[in-house]
Amino acid sequence: MNKTSLPQIDSLERQWYLVDAENKTLGRLATEVAAVLRGKNNPSFTPHLDTGDFVVVVNAEKIRVSGSKPTQKLYRRHSGRPGGMKTETFEALQDRIPERIVEKAIKGMLPHNALGRQMFRKLKVYKGSEHPHAAQKPQPLQLNPSASAQ
């Protein structure tokens, strides 16, 4: 009987990818980035190990959603105190903290456990086209053409 070989985590070569979110649809971009963070694009993918790569997302303020979502999609957060529920629309959050929209969409597509939190730490989202990870030489990640908003 053959024994399944597992990749050694310390021997994995982690790549850095750069994604430009300008005029991309939020959900379509998030699914592809989440797959790269999980490592689903690697031949050494193992569900219970973090084999994913690093992803840098720039131009988070230029992400798009379809239909009436800019005015109707709500983001909720709670302070933990009685009556501490805060609700904000997509437009308002995009004006205030556009990085949080992309982060929340991608985080919801990762496993909801300690492994998912570890994968989420490899995501870097920035407003504008500048980022501090030039030393890692991130390669542009080719997204599916349907991710671009019409």
From Swiss-Prot:
Q: Which Pfam families match?
A: Ribosomal_L13 (PF00572)
- Which residues fall in a compositionally biased region of kind Polar residues? 139-150
**GO CC term, one of those recorded:** cytosolic large ribosomal subunit
Give the GO terms filed under biological process for this record. Answer: negative regulation of translation; translation
InterPro entries per record? Ribosomal_uL13, Ribosomal_uL13_bac-type, Ribosomal_uL13_CS, Ribosomal_uL13_sf
Domain of life the protein comes from: Bacteria
MF term (GO), any = structural constituent of ribosome
Q: Which UniProt keywords apply?
A: Ribonucleoprotein, Ribosomal protein
In this chain, the stretch annotated as Disordered covers 128-150
Q: What does this protein do?
A: This protein is one of the early assembly proteins of the 50S ribosomal subunit, although it is not seen to bind rRNA by itself. It is important during the early stages of 50S assembly.
| HAMAP family per UniProt | Ribosomal_uL13
- Subunit and interaction comment: Part of the 50S ribosomal subunit.
Identify its protein family. Answer: Belongs to the universal ribosomal protein uL13 family.
What name does the UniProt record give this protein? Large ribosomal subunit protein uL13
Gene transcribed to yield this protein: rplM
